[in-house]
Amino acid sequence: MLRHSLRWFLRFVLVAVIIPIVLGAAISYARGWPESWRNARWESSGLLPQARDVPEALVMVIAARTGRWKSIFAEHTAIVLKPEGASDWTRYDVVGWGSPVRRNAYAADALWYGN
């Protein structure tokens, strides 16, 4: 009974965990990774409307793939705020463990290194 349960558990882990990770890695590799974060595109992706065209207050969490092999497992997230009636978005994000929160280092909906 235990042996049968262990066999089913291992099959589940293979199908639910291992195969998706391997497929994700293969797809990411096939698409190609940027050579360096210094050469990456950082401009606006065009996903957000102009802040002045949105009268209400908004809080958004945006995410983009990280660079190279980390993109298999991780995304970079940023919080984007717009107070009611404001004419600009405000973006907050952290790059690197223990680093301070950055404010408006890039466009609110900027592409990230892994994009």
Regions found by a protein language model. Give the residues of each.
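N-terminal Lys/Arg-rich, disordered targeting/topogenic segments
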Residues: 1-7
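Hydrophobic membrane-insertion alpha-helices, especially the h-region
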Residues: 10-28
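Glycine-rich catalytic cores of cysteine/serine-nucleophile enzymes that process amide/ester linkages
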Residues: 32-48, 52-115
